[in-house]
Amino acid sequence: MKRGVKKLIFKDMHPLLRLAKSHERRSVYLMLESQFQSKLIKKLKKLFPGCIVVKNDPGYLQGFPDLTVYYGDKWATLECKQSAGAKKQPNQEYYVGKMNEMSFSRFICPENEEEVLNDLQQTFQS
């Protein structure tokens, strides 16, 4: 940083610049979640050979989990989150709960990934 130049504080920014910065952060957040999702899909295919992983259309049913995994005669849905503290969208709790009553559904993030995949493995093997 140049001598005498103060770092801009977010709240002091022009509203349009603040909006652009906010959008920038959301884009990074989504990119990171999508990276986690891509790695997760690869892990699922390795862990459950022959499974089919479908990325659900987020515009079709708001709050419906991101992924559906079909393996043998069983299925599961997974809602991917960048972190355990990531904000949940409206209806996500409802659909994860509803789908879990029918079969298996969880919120999954890097912090609980191992636990969720172990639970999923037990479900698919039962």
Regions found by a protein language model. Give the residues of each.
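Catalytic phosphate/metal-binding cores of nucleic-acid and nucleotide-processing enzymes, i.e., regions
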Residues: 2-126
